[in-house]
């Protein structure tokens, strides 16, 4: 392989993950500004995901990671969520992401239904991949599974769709 080709391949990865980290950091900032009585924990940039068993010791799946946990003023968990920057790739990435989200939502809601906490699941997604009509349709179907407990937003939708009343509703 010519040096130029190798350099081009390596250059593509120099900022790998940066857009996702920027998105996560901005979400944390917006959340803190919009909901000063609530708290949000998790890695704002690079860092280990939060395993749900560390929040809920009786959570049945020891390998269920989340990107953040939102807590009310008393410290009780009220929401968990995921932040993803979707590139412009569709295909397998698209199917894996949304299919995994559906399974995850079902698992978390099933667990929480027995405990009656009213836990919400928030999916923060952004990036040009959302322009793929099928990807956005899949996200809309995900939210439609239980709009009282599931929310899919972009940063532009944050102020319009993510409300404290919804977060705190049991």
Identify the residue ranges that each predicted region occupies.
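Short, well-structured beta-strand/strand-turn elements
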Residues: 34-44
């Amino acid at each position: 392989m010519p040096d130029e080709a190798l350099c081009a391949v390596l250059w593509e990865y120099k900022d790998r993950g940066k857009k996702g980290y920027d998105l996560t950091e901005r979400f944390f900032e917006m959340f803190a500004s919009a909901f000063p009585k609530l708290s949000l924990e998790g890695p704002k940039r690079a860092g280990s995901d939060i395993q749900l068993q560390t929040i809920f010791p009786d959570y049945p799946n020891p390998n269920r990671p989340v990107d953040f946990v939102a807590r009310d003023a008393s410290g009780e968990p009220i929401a968990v969520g995921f932040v993803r920057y979707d590139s412009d790739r569709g295909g397998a990435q698209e199917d894996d992401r949304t299919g995994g989200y559906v399974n995850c939502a079902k698992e978390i809601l099933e667990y929480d239904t027995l405990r009656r906490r009213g836990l919400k699941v928030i999916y923060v997604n952004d990036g040009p991949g959302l322009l793929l009509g099928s990807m956005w349709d899949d996200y809309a179907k995900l939210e439609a599974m239980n709009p009282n407990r599931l929310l899919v937003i972009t940063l532009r939708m944050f102020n319009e769709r993510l409300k404290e009343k919804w977060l705190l509703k049991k």
